[in-house]
Structure formats: C-alpha cells, structure tokens
Amino acid sequence: MASCWRLILFLSVTRWLSDYSEALSGLSTSYAALLRIKKSSTSPFGSKSRPRFSSPSLGTISVSPPSWRGAAQQYHSPGNLYHSSDAFRQDESVDYGPVFVQEPDDVIFPTDSDEKKVALNCEVRGNPSPSYRWLRNGTEIALESDYRYSLIDGTFIISNPSELRDSGLYQCLATNSFGSILSREATLQFAYLGNFSGRTRSAVSVREGQGVVLMCSPPPHSPEIIYSWVFNEFPSFVAEDSRRFISQETGNLYISKVQTSDVGSYICLVKNAVTNARVLSPPTPLTLRNDGVMGEYEPKIEVHFPFTVTAAKGTTVKMECFALGNPVPTITWMKVNGYIPSKSRLRKSQAVLEIPNLQLDDAGIYECTAENSRGKNSFRGQLQIFTYPHWVQKLNDTQLDSGSPLQWECKATGKPRPTYRWLKNGAPLLPQSRVDTVNGILAIQSVNQSDAGMYQCLAENKYGAIYASAELKILASPPSFELNQVKKSIIVTKDRGVLIECEPQGSPKPAISWRKGDKAVRANKRIAILPDGSLRILNASKADEGKYICQGVNIFGSAEIIASLSVKEPTRIELTPKRTELTVGESIVLNCKAIHDASLDVTFYWTLKGQPIDFEKEGGHFENIRAQASSADLMIRNILLMHAGRYGCRVQTTADSVSDEAELLVRGPPGPPGVVIVEEITESTATLSWSPATDNHSPISSYNLQARSPFSLGWQTVKTVPEVITGDMESAMAVDLNPWVEYEFRVVATNPIGTGDPSIPSRMIRTNEAVPKTAPSNVSGRSGRRHELVIAWEPVSEEFQNGEGFGYIVAFRPNGTRGWKEKMVTSSEASKFIYRDESVPPLTPFEVKVGVYNNKGDGPFSQIVVICSAEGEPTAAPTDVTATSVSVSEIFVVWKHVKESLGRPQGFEISYWKDTEPEDSVETVRTRGNESFVMLTGLEGNTLYHLTVRAYNGAGYGPPSREASTTTKRHPPREPPGNLRWEQQGSQVSLGWEPVRPLANESEVMGYKVFYRQEGHSEGQVIETQKPQAVVPLPEAGVYIIEVRAYSEGGDGTASSQIRVPSYSGGKITSAQSTLHSLSKWSSVTLLLALMLPSSSW
C-alpha cells in the first residue's frame, strides 16, 4: 500500500516539475524537484463548491453547520393558549416575525482557490418578507463601504476575499415589522500554506546508539497541517516504528536510537489538511560522529501529551508519548484509578493512544511509561471531556393581552454549565424595572405594546453557543362578537336550566354585564353570571321569557349582542309494549308516542343496545313507520337472536330531548356448547364432557354427539351411552368407534324451537389398538405363469385395520386335502399373493382363504373359495402363415392355430421387420381372442418385410411360427393429372385431362378417380374410370368442387388442382368460356363504378 502511495505521489510531483525549475536552480536537482510539490498542490474544491465546517475542530470539512455554534432554532409547537404554530406561520394570510430557514455555516476559504468569491448563506421566512443585514465581529457591515460586498436575497457575497480584511465572525440579522433575529456566529477562515525558509539547515551529528530529534519548523499555515518525512530522495518516506516517530503535534522526527542505516538527508513534508497543498523543507543531514558508540541509558520522554487535554464528547482524541533511549524503549499506557476504554486503539508502535467517540466517563488521568533494561520514565496528564450546549427546554411564540404578565424559560445542558443571555430584536435585552432576567428565565410584570418583538435566548459555554427564538405579540382591541356569535333565539322547556353564552373577543379581556329589556340582570338563587360571562338560569318559567342583552366593555370600546329566550312546556314520551317475548322468525311493532308543545316539531330516533339503528344496513329486518306527526312505529320483521335487547326511542325538539326504553326477549335455538374435552379413550369408546350451551330463553331438551374421522364423509352422529343425552347433562360416552382411528368430536344442543350451531371441535384423538375384526373381501384367483397359484383379494381399509403392524395371512390347500399351508404378507396395502411350486400342474383347483393380523393378534379369515393354479404357456406354433401386400403401407397376415389341451391362448403376437434391418429392430402387434388375421399398417412402400406369429397367454409366449415374407406395393404416381378441362351441358360436366405417366419406382396407373362434392358439404362421391376422361352428373343446383387422382395397386396418387363448376341448366359452357364470362362480369362492374365516380377522383 505504501509503495502504491509513493508511486501516486511521485507521478503528481513530476507533473509540475517545470514550474519551479528557475526558482530552485541553486538547489540540487532532486531536492528542487521535491520542493515544487507546494506549488502543484491545489484545493480539492472546484469553483462550484466551498469547504464548510461541521465541528469546532478546524481540521475537518463538512457541508452541515455544527449544532453548538449558535445555530438559531425555532420551536413553534402548541404549548399554551397564546402560542402560534409553525403551520400557522406558513399561512401567507397571517403576519408573523422572522424565522430562520438556513443560518450561515463556518467557511474555510483556500487562498489559492480559482473562485475568488465567498458566499455566506442566510435564508429567513416571515410575513411581511424580512430584510437582511450582516455583522462582522459584532459590527454591522455597510455594504456601500466596500465595492467587494454584495447581498443577493439573504446571501452575503465577498469578492476577492482577503484574510487581513475579511476573516472573523459573521452574523445575519433579519428584520420585518415584528422585529429582528440574529443568527449564530459563522467563522470565515482562510486556508493557506507558506514556504519553508530557504536557508540551508545545519547537519546534525550524533554517535551511534544515541537518540536524536530532527526539527521540522513548519512555515506559516492555516488550519492544521499533516507531517511526514522523506529520507534521502523522494518518494522514500520514513517508516515509523518503535525506533522512529513523527509527532503530528510538533512535526519533529524522533529517532530513539540512531543506527548506521539512519545516516542520510531528511526532508520535512507538510500538507494542508484543507487545500492538500504540500511544501518541503530544506534537507537536514544526519551524520555519525567518530568518537565511538553511545552506551546504554534509561528512557527520556521527548514527546508527550499536554498536562491537560480537552476534547468534546463524541469526538476522537489522540495522545502522543515517545522516548529516546538505548535499548529502544517500550511504551505502555494506563489510566490511573480506572481502565483504559476497550474501544481505544494503540497506533504507531503504541506511541499514540487513540480514544474514539469520547464519553464523559472516559475522562481521567492517563499515564504513559517508557521502559528499557536501563530504567523507565513516566508522564501523567488529565483528559477532560466537555459538551456543547444542548437545549432541554425551548421557547414558544406567545401572544398576551396588554397588562398580562409574561414568564419565558429556556434550559440547556452542557459542560461547563451554560450561561444565558437574552436578546430583543437582535440586541442585548437590558434589565428594567418591569423586566427581569435570571439565568434562563425572562419575566415581565405587566406587558405593554412596547414589549412586542422578537426575543432570543442564548445559551453558551466556552465551547459554543445555541440560540432559541420566539415572537411576543401584545394584543390590544375593542370587544367584538364576530368570532363568538350568540344564538339570537333560544328555546328552553319549563323547569329546565338554560345557559346563554357571552364570550366577546377583546384585549384586555372585556368586562361583561347583562340586561333584560331595560333592566340590569341581578344574580339570585336561580340566575347567575358565570366567570366566562355566560348567563345561567335554573328552573326556567314563563316569567323568564324576553330579550337579554350582553355587553362587553374594555378601555378600547364596547359591544353588545341580543338573545331572545322562549319557555315551552316539556315533552313527554311513551314507548309500548315495555317487555315482550318472541320466538325467532316472528315479528313485532314498537309504538313510540310523544306529547309536546304544539309549536315545536318533533323528530324520532331509534336505538338498540344504546347504538343507533341503521335501517339501510339491517337486511330489511327494521322499518321506521311514521303514521302520525306525534308518534312513530318500529317494525321488526323475521326477528333474530341478535335483535334481543333494550330498544330506545328518543324524541328531539328544538327545546328538549326525552327518551324511553322497552325490552325485547327473543327465544331461539340454543347456542353452541362450550369446549368439548375428551376425558377417557378406549378401543371403541370416548368419554366426553362439555360446557352447557346458552338456551336462548328456551330450555335445552337434548344434546347430540357427532364425530369426524379421515374416513368419514363429514360429521356423523355417533351412538352414545346413555342413548338419549338430556339437556341437563354435560358428559356422555361415544361408543361403537373403530379402534386405532383419529376422531374429532363436537356437540350440538336442541330445544323445542330447534337445533343450534355445533360446538368447536375437540382436539384430534386416536382410539386404542385392538385385534382386527374385518376379513378381506372378494378373494379370487388371477392368471399367472405355469406352476403359479395367484391369490387376490380386496385390501382392508385403514379404517378397519385396528392397529399398527397390520398384514395378511394367506392360507391355501389343494382341493380335497386337509392341511392348510399359510403365508404371511406384511404389507397392509397388498392385494395378491403368488405361490410357485414346480410340482403343481396347470389348472389345479385349490381351496384358499385370507385372514388378517396386527400387533394385537390375529383376526378372522375370509370365506373359503376354490381357484385354479395358472395354466401353461402355449406349446404349439401357428401354421400356414400367409402375408399379402395390400397397398404401399399395408400387409394382410392370416394363420392357423393348432388347438391343444394345455396353454389356451389369450391372443397372438405378430413380429415384423424390414429385410434391410437387423432382427433386434423388430416391431410387434398383438391381437386378443381367437382372431387369426391382422392388418399391418404404417409400412414403407416397395419394401420387403419378414414376419412371424406366436400365441401368448398369462403364463407366457408360445413358439414362433415359420417366417413369412412379402413386399409392399410400389408408391402410387406422385404426378397429378394435368391440364384438367371441362365442358358443362345441362346437368352434366364432361372432364378431360392428360394421362399420368409413373416413374420407374412407382406403380403402374390402373385408372383414375374423380372426386366431386357440392360446395359447403363434407361428403362427396367418386367415379372411377380407366380413361383420362369422365362425365360427372350434377343433380342439384349449386357450385361443385371437382378433383382427379390416378390410382394404382399402391393406392391413390396426388390430386389435381380443384375446379369449381356451377350447375347450369341452359346452353353449353366450357372451362374457357367460364373464365371469359367471369372476366366479363368483373369488367362490367368496374366500368359501372368508373362512370359513377366524379372526375376529380380519377
């Protein structure tokens, strides 16, 4: 990796060697070339971007501002009655003070940048739109004072920036009619790297084994730089190890113990961390003295971290420690009264302790120790961790009535603990008799219009500052009812209470007074003016009717509003019937009658179980019938269980609302029983229990048990003990179950009204094993080979196998004998058994039976049946086999079969093959029964075939016959009949064509076939002729399709082209005339169309 870097750096150096050749003519060629690095290195940032800081360290570059450097933060979340939200501020119709969208970032400007401009960004929103001003080091910048300054929107631009005139702290001040806010401080810093002094450096001479420090003495620079050293010539860099160390704090090169290989020329190379510019120092020669080798000595620490190291939480700190000594010292680290964090890393042969992501508990005293065989030396320093200010509590925008008190509090954390300052409209807030600022609290005893404006709380410690902004609005307006209108007409029923609201808007808060007509309203036991200004009247009567005037007054004016109060008789209601019992499927009408003041309109509302009835979504069960103005009926049709409950009728008038309820009980089939539990299981029984079902207001008369297995068609009712399960029972036994079968059970309840829904199925259980009780059925014999007895049966279903290890016992004996021979078949799926005995003659009768067994024992046998052993395979070959070629692809084969006493044939197999192919390419065709002929098809024409015939049955094949041979017919002529001509006269068509002449490998023409059919029909007729002509009758009107083929012993040849002949009863038409006739008709139509078209279309 190092060699790769060296190559890259070397190439970058040689690219610009010509720039400084004259200026460095006094130096050696290699050193002059190295020095030119400083000119060739430029900022990595092009003309379209600038570096920006993200932390207080000036060594890193980012595009985002630091969170601690005075970043003004606005918080407008709802906090109290008077605040305004951020969404409110974005409403263009609402006026509000300035709010920062973007504050200026720290900027590092490379002095050698091609873009000679610096832009400090500032964006603020507000209504009206804010104006911008800028401050440098706390003093407002006069734009007209320097031609280099310009302001575009809020962005401050400096052309041709200069470090002497322009570096410093910049702030953006945004102002509109509501006040001003000041941004965080943004630092403008210039990045540069000067040149080393051109003076020749003196040689450093030491003894071998002695330690040495080579000074770098870097040139002026900003910000920090990175140090490295070149040995003798570029690109040979000094490699750091336990003996050599380059301090990034001092830039010096430390060699703890000089060796002869260290003799040479050393050059310090520095690189600006921002611009990447590089410069090289003059060489420093290192030589060895001639007065002997340096003896061993104890370590001397030449590089160490400061006594106090200060770093920010979350950053990375690097502490250096290196010593000179002979032998070369070893560096170790420790934390006094603690442990070095596990996240720490040791770099450069342990000379650098690096601790990333610093936390507060990483602080403490750290010690480095340098040790060799001659002794040791240590250094201690303290690591202190600070944190930037961070908000815990911010400000909210606030609006207050004039004269109200204000208390704002902002809180921030940080180490050291932050102090607070307050700004108003961008300027420090000075203490006054009414204004008090203590830490983060701002208190104003009695606000007035002069206090309105933009306020900022600034929390800061020695490492940074943060801003929080808020707007204070002072409200001052006469009373108004525009936003809180009072009902002009209020209706209340007799003996009820009424509240007449009065909440005028105004600042300060208006004082409220009430009048009825011309008289002031006096408070008494029934009448009271509430703190919010509303008028409350209890137990209203006719005497309380009239016009009420509410008046609001403050220092800016008054306003009043009038409300008219009417007192009516209270509404009464009656809902009937009160309590009713029904059965599912029945219907009922509930009647709701209202007695009310005749001047009031009434509205009826229906509820079920406290919820409004949705008449459109209830499936037609409910209907609201309004027959009279003062009553309403609720019709419930085809009632369901879910319709049971309390029905409410509410009558609503403009004055009051009253309601009444009625209860409806619905009887129906029972609900599903509770969880079904299988308590005990045997081979054929299961004891079940369940929770009672809901009877739905009709006692349960009985329960029914149902079961389901993999072998049943759905749920089936099972027999139980007791046979009848009464409604008061909660358990029963299912009986007559099959052993070793998985079952699910469920329970169904029944009452006089009907049968309810079933319970949830029980868990799946399996009955216990038992000896099988079902014997195989349909025991019979099957065909097999000679000397075989084939016994077949229908396998027993798994449902009746009753346990594991199920199999079959096959017993058989020759008919008329006494002893049984038994064989075990272990497969439960087996359906046959083959017994082979060479001494058994064919067709010997046997008595057979098949039994069953499983792991629990043997089960029953089937009934005894008599079957025969297999017959023998045929022993005689067919005779008189004859093969006759029928066509180009067919051979007809016939034979005779010699009847014999054994080996009755089931059919015959014909094997055939081409003369030109080996016998292993033989093909076969089978017949069944006693047929003694077959037609072979799909053969090749003009080919010699050989064939044999043999009989077969279930025992096997008989011997083949003698071989027979024949040659298939030659192919029919492939040339179709040509020059087909026709002449129609009446209902006949005379045809003629040129004769077909076959090729040498084709069969001779025996004649011709004329195929004709009526167009649109699939079936046609054929006329055969030996001459190249024929007469075709056309019996019906229509168009006929005609084609001609030659035929030979090889079959039909290729068809001629088809002709279409229309039936024609008058005159004589030839094929040529038909063509002319068709052309004539087409020409006539074309001419007619041409005459009809306008001339412009031609």
From Swiss-Prot:
Coiled coil: none annotated. Disulfide bonds join 122-172, 216-268, 321-368, 410-457, 502-550, 592-649. It is found in: Cell membrane. InterPro entries: FN3_dom, FN3_sf, Ig-like_dom, Ig-like_dom_sf, Ig-like_fold, Ig_I-set, Ig_sub, Ig_sub2. Residues 672-770, 775-872, 877-971, 976-1066 form the Fibronectin type-III domain. Its main location: membrane. It is a lipid-anchor; GPI-anchor. GO terms for cellular component: GABA-ergic synapse; presynaptic membrane; side of membrane. Glycans are attached at residues 137, 195, 396, 448, 539, 778, 815, 930, 1001. Keywords: Cell adhesion, Cell membrane, Disulfide bond, Glycoprotein, GPI-anchor, Immunoglobulin domain, Lipoprotein, Membrane, Repeat, Signal. Residues 98-189, 195-281, 299-384, 389-473, 479-568, 570-659 form the Ig-like C2-type domain. Expressed in the nervous system. Preferentially expressed in the central auditory pathways. Residues 1072-1098 form a propeptide. Residues 1-23 form the signal peptide. Residues 956-982 are annotated as: Disordered. Belongs to the immunoglobulin superfamily. Contactin family. Interacts with PTPRG. Contactins mediate cell surface interactions during nervous system development. Has some neurite outgrowth-promoting activity in the cerebral cortical neurons but not in hippocampal neurons. Involved in neuronal activity in the auditory system. This is Contactin-5. The gene is Cntn5.
